[in-house]
Each structure stands twice: as structure tokens, then as C-alpha cells.
Amino acid sequence: MTLRLRFWGTRGSVPAPGPRTVRYGGNTPCLEVRTDTGALVILDAGTGIRELGRSLVADGDGISAEIFLTHAHWDHIQGIPFFAPIFRPGNRFTIWGSKALETSIDRVIRDQMAPVVFPVGFDELQARVEFREIAVEERTGDGYVVSSFAVQHPGGALGYRFTDASQPKRSFVYISDNELGASEGYGSGAGWREALVAFVRGASLLVHDATYTTDEYAQHRGWGHSTFEDAVMLALDAGVQRLVLYHHKPERSDDDIDACVAACRALVARRGETLEVTAAAEGMTLEV
């Protein structure tokens, strides 16, 4: 069995359209996952989910999907009111959010569609939408097993590991927002990084926050994001096969991202390792 991935949004914090971002994309986070059984999983609902929705509607009705949100910051939920399938009867969606959030994910999504900020209320949606809370636990889906891990990000966030139900050695980890460079203020505990490495260990693919350069991080410590060098070191420590840099800084141009990828590959080479490194781009497809 194969898990098939497609990136619909790769940018962090705020959409960044324009001529400098056409290759890697300007939409905020959204990743589509398909299993051989036909199940649809959506990771995060940034502005990238709008184009995913248009694609799904073009394929017909009767759409069913599980949407796993890493957390409730704007760039990970702002596409939901523009997700066309959610307005159509006969479609069904389960939206999963962290149990550790200060406010339920149900309340957060409803509030972003309140009349003062959006013209169509949540209760006017015609699809069936169910909200569920996920703790740090493992559960089985249609053709996959998903587990979660509490990462370091203001307000709380989760990373997810998806494993092929029929082939446990095939798995990928999705960690969109995570600060690897500091632990103070998060209450993670002394063994947090070791536990994170164990969570990621042996994955076929790691999609990880790579928002900052080392120089940029010095000015943004505590903001909840990692450098691309830190992402490489996590991937190496965990023995993953492939690293995909994600959550690109809005100001980062396509050429800048190319330079980050080149620097990561040089770092891997200096350490004598074979980790494959690339950067997430809208429209990019991968198989696990």
C-alpha cells in the first residue's frame, strides 16, 4: 500500500503571492494525503485548502475526509471558509484538533465565521461537519494509523505521524510549526527532544518547519519556529530517509529557498550522511 501526498500550501504565517514565490508557492499550509483504499486525509487548512477544494468539487460529490489541524493559528485554519466542498450537501468532514488548546477547535472555527468577520455563518454550511479532539495517542483510520506528539509552539501544537496500516515500515511525519532551538516557556521537560527523536525515528519522510536561517532565529527566539539547519539535525538524529523543508517564511523568495536547500545538502554532505533534502512546493507530489 502507498500513501500519496500533494502539497497545496507551503508558506507560513501569511499568504505570500507574487512573482518571487511562484515556484514554491504562496499559500499557507495544506497537505493532501491519499491511501490506496481511497481515503482522503487533509493536514491543516490554510489558504491552500481552497484550491484543493476546487479540485475535489471537480471530481464530483460525496466527498468524505478527515482534517487534522496541527493547531489553531490563523495560517492553519483561514482556508476553511473558502473550502467549497464544505458548502455542499452530502459531503462529510471530521475536523481533528488538539485537546490541549485553550479553546475547543469547534469554537475557534465557528468564531472565524462569525458575522463580524465573515458573511456566511458556520451553521449555514450544508456538509456534515464533526469536530473531534485528539490527545497524544494513536488511532487507526482507513488504511493508515496516526499518532500525535506535542511540539513546541505558542498556544500548543501537534505533530503527526502517519503509518501505512499494511506496511508499518512506511510512514511520514508532519510537523508544521515547532521550535527546536529552545525549550524555555513551553514546559516540555528535559527529555522532550529525545522523545521527539523517538517519535520521528525511522520515518520514510519528515515534513518539518524550516522558517528561519540561523541569523533570523536570533531575532525570533520563542516565536515557535525552527531553522532549516535544526530541521536537518533532527532528521539526521532520527534516521529518516528524506526531509522536506516546510512553512517557508513569507519574505523568502524562490531563489532564497533554493539557497536554503543547497545549504542543507552541504551540511548533510559535510557530516558524511545520505539524507535527501528538498523544499515543499505547491503541486509537489510524493509517495511513501
Identify the function of each model-found stretch:
Residues 1-173, 181-186, 197, 257-288:
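Binuclear metal-dependent hydrolase catalytic cores
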Residues 176:
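Conserved beta-strand-loop-short alpha-helix elements that form
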